[in-house]
Amino acid sequence: MAFSSLLRSAASYTVAAPRPDFFSSPASDHSKVLSSLGFSRNLKPSRFSSGISSSLQNGNARSVQPIKATATEVPSAVRRSSSSGKTKVGINGFGRIGRLVLRIATSRDDIEVVAVNDPFIDAKYMAYMLKYDSTHGNFKGSINVIDDSTLEINGKKVNVVSKRDPSEIPWADLGADYVVESSGVFTTLSKAASHLKGGAKKVIISAPSADAPMFVVGVNEHTYQPNMDIVSNASCTTNCLAPLAKVVHEEFGILEGLMTTVHATTATQKTVDGPSMKDWRGGRGASQNIIPSSTGAAKAVGKVLPELNGKLTGMAFRVPTSNVSVVDLTCRLEKGASYEDVKAAIKHASEGPLKGILGYTDEDVVSNDFVGDSRSSIFDANAGIGLSKSFVKLVSWYDNEWGYSNRVLDLIEHMALVAASH
């Protein structure tokens, strides 16, 4: 069972175990959650509503059990707090992320995908691509092609549209209030705004954007404002790095850092050597090479954590694996700490304030062990090292497809709940 991101996004705050009366009023409860704006350097909450803070006074913050922040679990005492029904979503672009967003949405009780637009894929091929997936396995539900413009997924109809120009997609007529822009094409405010012409209320870009407000669930989604009609869910790598950097910076301070992501192959790469005028190395065969590449993921952390702006940068290695990537963050700390101290802080956050967003493992894992992991970032305690009290290398895994797609839906529902409280 899934639950609203008002609850899921509480991963960015240390919140006491939910009481039945805490969620009695959507508007007032939402303002309570928004009133807590992060942690102090020791990972304790910096601001809380009086009701929550009083529950913390009787014990150390490390013993507090927070609201879970996964897309698949819900505390029994928590009720859905949106205004009415499910949040209706449309998807533009039925690639890797578009398909997984639809897959995951079918297992949630807070979101319903009502339409998919892709000018290059007809309804029959959409059904085939949704049913079979070489990485994540076969779709467990039912898929039927009703006609050229309708799919039936788990007994619910999904409209199929084939428009090249997003301004021509009748989102309002299709019942979609929120649109996932996952084509990889319309990633700026001006381009993504075309969806608003068709009646969409909000657009979520499933990629970094040059000018749209950027959010990472568990890090800065609490800064979202209801007048923001177009937002970016950042990149999968930023979603992995930002929660890790948040914890380390708030506990020890990050003076500067370099990030490397060892990234699985993506659809933009070539199966064999081919032309790539902007990135010559990027045109080399994906299955034959480890390919150095640029990435703005580390710099983008400065957009979601302004206190780290200008302190992080990084690069990528594209490697011949189909899924799951790993971030290597090497950084200088402001406050002296052993590697064991850093591990302890991350473990605490993974079990408390960032549970379901940031994970922790001390087992001897490899990349394939994280296929289908819904968390944004899973810290590998055995893979990192410390050189001194102020210089550490931190390693964190992420399913760059599945985890990211979960966060897209989490961000949508958070936006819907903000709208419901205003």
Curated annotation (Swiss-Prot):
One of its GO terms (biological process) is carbohydrate metabolic process. It catalyses: D-glyceraldehyde 3-phosphate + phosphate + NAD(+) = (2R)-3-phospho-glyceroyl phosphate + NADH + H(+). D-glyceraldehyde 3-phosphate binds at residues 235-237, 266, 295-296, 318. Residues 50-84 are annotated as: Disordered. The record marks 263 as: Activates thiol group during catalysis. GO terms for cellular component: chloroplast stroma; plastid. The active site is at 236 (nucleophile). This is Glyceraldehyde-3-phosphate dehydrogenase GAPCP1, chloroplastic. It comes from Arabidopsis thaliana. The lineage of its organism: Eukaryota, Viridiplantae, Streptophyta, Embryophyta, Tracheophyta.
